[in-house]
Design a protein with these regions (language model features):
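A basic, amphipathic helix-loop patch mediating RNA/tRNA/ribosome contacts
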Residues: 1-50, 84-85
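A short glycine-rich, Lys/Arg-flanked "PGG" loop and its adjoining helix->strand segment in the class I
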Residues: 160-177
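Short, glycine-/aromatic-enriched active-site segment of Class I SAM-dependent methyltransferases
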Residues: 182-199
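Flexible, glycine-/basic-rich loop-and-beta segments that form/coincide
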Residues: 236, 240-267
Length: 267
């Protein structure tokens, strides 16, 4: 075996993970130890001869995305029992899985890609798999059920382009938990090597713009926190909690939130 083999591939080859995607999720969640030392980067190589073990709880969802929605549900007053939901940017389906495990009656799993949704979810009668579908142009004809809840985890596009269509799909009082990704919200000149945004000042600007875009699209912003895990390249990301309602916005101390996120998720 080549000593250049990536850690995520090693986990799969050694039977420690069902698939490479699940291996990446377990590694990035901090559960993988090589020769007794935690390694949290899936692309780490040069470990072929070292003992590898997975410690602690295995990932409860088909991907680590479920951990992000799990935190949103613990932080904000979100309950999904018997709710009609949408997972925008479903990919493997971590958010969808989390919704189902929390009692969702039906989930529309929407992604512009194809063939990514985990088979467990694809074959679940509560899931409507909507592949090759650009959420920016979703219509009530495609999702005829008024949505109680939607999650958004999209890449290479700003949330402000998703909000208008989603507003028309949510019932009055419907809620959103969305992932705010600085690498796709900041201007190109503010994005560093490998697409990583490290500057706390830029993070604060991104959150301020998020608040503006949400309000311009008639959503009430009731909460913001940081994601419990970094993005694939190491980006700190944030979670927003929105509602289609006439309630007043919450009050947010963005500098403190950004400082806390950098302290808790430091390299």
């Amino acid at each position: 075996m080549s000593n250049k083999t990536r850690l995520d591939i090693l986990l799969t080859e050694r039977g420690l993970a069902e698939s490479r995607q699940k291996a990446q999720a377990v590694i990035m969640a901090g559960h993988v130890f090589v020769a007794g030392q935690r390694v949290d980067k899936p692309g780490t190589a040069g470990l072929s001869d070292a003992p590898i073990e997975v410690r602690g709880h295995t990932l409860p969802y088909v991907s680590r995305g479920g951990l992000k929605l799990e935190k949103a549900m613990k932080t904000f007053p979100i309950t999904l029992t018997d709710k009609i939901c949408a997972d925008i940017g479903a990919s493997t389906g971590g958010f969808t899985d989390c919704m189902l495990q929390n009692g969702a009656r039906k989930v529309y799993s929407v992604d512009v890609g194809y063939g990514q949704l985990d088979w467990k979810l694809r074959s679940d009668p509560r899931v409507v798999c909507m592949e090759r579908t650009n959420a920016r142009y979703l219509t009530p004809e495609q999702i005829p059920d008024p949505l109680d809840f939607a999650s958004i985890d999209v890449s290479f596009i700003s949330l402000k382009l998703i909000f208008p269509a989603l507003y028309g799909l949510l019932r009055q009082g419907g809620e959103i938990a969305c992932l705010i990704k600085p690498q796709f919200e900041a201007g190109r000149e503010k994005v560093g090597k490998k697409g990583v945004v490290r500057d706390p000042t830029v993070h604060q600007e991104v959150l301020e713009h998020f608040l503006t875009h949400a309000r311009e699209n008639h959503f009430t912003v009731l909460g913001i926190t940081y994601s419990p895990i970094r993005g694939p390249e190491g980006n700190i990301e944030y979670l927003g909690y929105l509602k289609k309602c006439d309630e007043p916005d919450g009050s947010f101390d963005l500098p403190t939130l950004v400082a806390e996120s950098h302290s808790q998720l430091k390299d």
